[in-house]
From Swiss-Prot:
This is Tryptophan synthase beta chain. The modification N6-(pyridoxal phosphate)lysine is found at K91. NCBIfam families: trpB. Tetramer of two alpha and two beta chains. Its cofactor is pyridoxal 5'-phosphate. The gene is trpB. Its EC number is 4.2.1.20. The keyword Electron transport does not apply. It comes from Streptococcus pneumoniae (strain Hungary19A-6). Transmembrane segments: none annotated. The keyword Zinc-finger does not apply.
Length: 407
């Protein structure tokens, strides 16, 4: 069956749409019109492809992780190396596309939200390239966790606004960015960093990130002589790297798709971000999606060791894939992600982002289950430089606790 989502109202099955105040409706309709025009203009995509090649460094390699595969003794593991992009993660694919779109729309200023700082850095980078003014909204907690990325953004000419509302994390940064957009609609474009928000944002982000899956599909054929892998694995916060990998394979029903959610301290605690495991449908940031909420519909605080995964919702297309059982979403704890982080570093000499480490941790389990005849592609969504100090502190604290327990 042909997969034709979203419909004209921005729905993926029962999820998505645009639940925004009148003040924002004009902006999202203007954005949709401009995006449709750009899709119909071959020069837009040609220019973007040239930038992706010459500036970002695409295409990124599909790397056969031979050591990891042998270490596990299961399915062959191929890593889609989004960590090798300029700025160190998949985020630049979308940021560059949207800044180029904003420039074409005649906008002068760019605003964005960021959690781990990767989308903020990517947006500030693209804004610098196109000589546009840039403000990044970041939860105060994340500003503390990701001080290095804050400095990077400032170095790139962006202004970083620390958001002190709510729990001072990603969802609060999104709220602040949306408020700013309402106040400055005429000359400002808001670059959402994940496949979230009111239509057409989830579609735009998916389309710009689908370069991941398109490349991986062709590279897998070229490398193996086989048509398709047996499985895909990607971490899911809002879900843009995962939708970028999954979407070009969605009609290939022999390919199993797995999104790994942040289970934090465990899905049976209050400290996790496992939206599809524990959430239910609700409206957040202009879109109907699965959301972590209490009995009264209040949004719960999401928790993860990884700043890029602690979002209490998930992109509507992922909610739809989950609903129609096209993809499975599995929780991975902080502890498991830390093991994945160390394992890939030690065995392959690749230090992954904590976000990507959630995918690695599950891939290890899945490889054992599938066995050596099968193969999978794992999206290595970002590099781990930004997380090394945090992991060092965490491992040292864990070791000290163990020492006390043995004393």
């Amino acid at each position: 069956m042909a997969y034709q989502e979203p419909n004209k109202d921005g729905f993926y099955g029962k999820f998505g749409g645009r639940f925004v105040p009148e003040t924002l409706m004009t902006a999202v309709l203007e954005l949709e019109k401009a995006y449709r025009e750009s899709q119909a203009d071959p020069s837009f995509q040609e220019e973007l492809n040239q930038l992706l090649r010459q500036y970002v460094g695409r295409e990124t390699p599909l790397y056969y992780a031979k050591n990891l595969t042998q270490h596990i003794g299961g399915a062959k593991i191929y890593l889609k190396r989004e960590d090798l992009n300029h700025t160190g993660a998949h985020k630049i694919n979308n940021a560059l596309g949207q800044v180029w779109l904003a420039k074409r729309m005649g906008k002068k200023k760019i605003i964005a939200e960021t959690g781990a700082g990767q989308h903020g850095v990517a947006t500030a980078t693209a804004a610098a390239l196109f000589n546009m003014e840039c403000t990044i909204y970041m939860g105060e907690e994340d500003v503390k966790r990701q001080a290095l990325n804050v400095f990077r953004m400032e170095l790139l000419g962006a202004k970083v606004e620390a958001v002190t509302d709510g729990s001072r994390v990603l969802k609060d940064a999104v709220n602040a960015a949306l408020r700013s957009w309402v106040a400055n609609i005429d000359d400002t474009h808001y670059i959402l960093g994940s496949a979230l928000g009111p239509h057409p944002f989830p579609e735009i982000v998916r389309d710009f990130q689908s370069v991941i899956g398109r490349e991986a599909k062709q590279q897998y054929r070229d490398m193996t002589g086989q048509n398709l892998p047996d499985a895909l694995v990607a971490c899911v916060g809002g879900g843009s790297n995962a939708i970028g990998l999954f979407h070009p394979f969605v009609e290939d029903e022999s390919v199993a798709m797995y999104g790994t959610e942040a289970a934090g301290l465990g899905v049976d605690t209050e400290h996790h971000a496992a939206t599809l495991t524990k959430g239910r449908p609700g409206v957040l940031h202009g879109s109907l999606m699965d959301v972590l909420q209490d009995a009264h519909g209040q949004i719960l605080e999401a928790f993860s060791i990884s700043a890029g995964l602690d979002y209490p919702g998930i992109g509507p297309e992922h909610s739809h894939y989950h609903d129609i059982k096209r993809a499975s979403y599995v929780p991975v704890t902080d502890e498991e992600a830390l093991e994945g982080f160390q394992l890939l570093s030690r065995v392959e000499g690749i230090i992954p982002a904590l976000e990507s480490s959630h995918a690695i941790a599950f891939a290890v389990k899945l490889a054992k289950e599938l066995g050596p005849e099968k193969s999978m592609i794992v999206c290595l969504s970002g590099r781990g430089d930004k997380d090394v100090v945090q992991v060092k502190d965490r491992l040292e604290a864990d070791a000290a606790k163990k020492g006390e327990a043995h004393a």
